[in-house]
């Protein structure tokens, strides 16, 4: 029987920003459980929750897109043999807006985006239809095991 992957996790919320509803849904143990469910190898990850200004700046700087997006993943492993290391950046206002528009509980949407970002940190992508189908299938399976419905329905 294989052992569960180990996770070293650092959570960051922006200083001086009040995100009480978000923070209450995101205790470290909960975030760690969601991420671990999507890990296939040991990992060191930082998850930073940001406001729209920081989200937009990061998306513009690193992706050339001048808007805040829901999740950005910065994966630092240079080869498959390297440990999984990375930063997941979640933009709180965008996550909340999407959850409301999609009629999803905020916690369920955070779980989905954390699983999604964790898969990116491990090299998964959705640049073409086959990659997207594979990634969505893994996300749906992982979220189901965590008790969440299919995020794509």
UniProtKB/Swiss-Prot annotation:
Keywords in alphabetical order: Cytoplasm, Endonuclease, Hydrolase, Metal-binding, Nuclease, Ribosome biogenesis, rRNA processing, Zinc
Annotated cofactor note: Binds 1 zinc ion.
Name of the protein in question: Endoribonuclease YbeY
GO molecular function, one term: RNA endonuclease activity
Annotated localization: Cytoplasm
One matching Pfam family: YbeY
Cofactor: Zn(2+)
GO biological process: rRNA processing
Main location: cytoplasm
């Amino acid at each position: 029987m294989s052992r569960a992957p180990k996770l070293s996790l650092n959570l960051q919320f922006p200083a001086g920003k009040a995100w009480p509803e978000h923070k209450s849904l995101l205790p470290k143990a909960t975030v760690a459980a969601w991420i671990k469910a999507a890990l296939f190898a040991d990992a060191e990850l930082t998850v930073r929750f940001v406001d729209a200004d920081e989200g937009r700046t990061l998306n513009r700087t690193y992706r050339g897109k001048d808007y805040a997006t829901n999740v950005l993943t910065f994966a630092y492993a240079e080869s498959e043999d390297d440990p999984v290391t990375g930063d997941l950046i979640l933009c709180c206002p965008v996550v909340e807006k999407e959850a409301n528009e999609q009629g999803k509980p905020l916690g369920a949407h955070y779980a989905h985006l954390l699983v999604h970002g964790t898969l990116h940190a491990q090299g998964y992508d959705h640049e073409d239809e086959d990659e997207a189908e594979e990634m969505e299938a893994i996300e749906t399976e992982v979220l189901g095991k965590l008790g969440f419905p299919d995020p794509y329905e």
